[in-house]
Amino acid sequence: MRPSLVRLVRPRRPERKTSPILPPLKLYKALLRAHANKLPVELRPLGDQYVKAEFKAHKNIDNPLHIVGFLAQWQDYLKGIDGGEWINGKLSQQDLEKMSPEQIGQLHELMEEAKKAGASE
């Protein structure tokens, strides 16, 4: 039996399993839009301030690996917000092990601010 023409044709390049990374400005605007549409009103200012501060802090980074990692992580966060996964989201031990001490400190500060916001209700 001869193979069909469809089986002989191969794709020109492999398919991506992940979506391409959004440009920084589009990602930034999409994050703020997602906060406006998906987050509860009391959490929106906290989320917006954090996104703005992080993008401002990483504005002058020159290392392409850091840029790609930064944008990829924020894009994953955006998918979580859009999908509603943020409500029950948990950080795995593997993710914690990958973090630098500075990042763990930032995470702790974020946790404390979230607790303050929750206690003020």
UniProtKB/Swiss-Prot annotation:
Q: InterPro entries, alphabetically?
A: SDHAF3/Sdh7
Q: Chief location of this protein?
A: mitochondrion
Transit peptide location on this chain:
1-35
Would I find Transit peptide among this entry's keywords? Answer: yes
Disulfide-bonded cysteine pairs: these are none
**Superkingdom of this protein's organism:** Eukaryota
Q: Which UniProt keywords apply?
A: Chaperone, Gluconeogenesis, Mitochondrion, Transit peptide
Q: Which GO terms describe its biological process?
A: carbon utilization; gluconeogenesis; mitochondrial respiratory chain complex II assembly; regulation of gluconeogenesis; succinate metabolic process
Protein's UniProt keywords contain Cell inner membrane: no
Localization terms from the record: Mitochondrion matrix
Assigned protein family: Belongs to the complex I LYR family. SDHAF3 subfamily.
Q: What does this protein do?
A: Plays an essential role in the assembly of succinate dehydrogenase (SDH), an enzyme complex (also referred to as respiratory complex II) that is a component of both the tricarboxylic acid (TCA) cycle and the mitochondrial electron transport chain, and which couples the oxidation of succinate to fumarate with the reduction of ubiquinone (coenzyme Q) to ubiquinol. Promotes maturation of the iron-sulfur protein subunit of the SDH catalytic dimer, protecting it from the deleterious effects of oxidants. May act together with SDHAF1.
* Assembly with partners or alone: Interacts with the iron-sulfur protein subunit within the SDH catalytic dimer.
The protein, known as: Succinate dehydrogenase assembly factor 3, mitochondrial
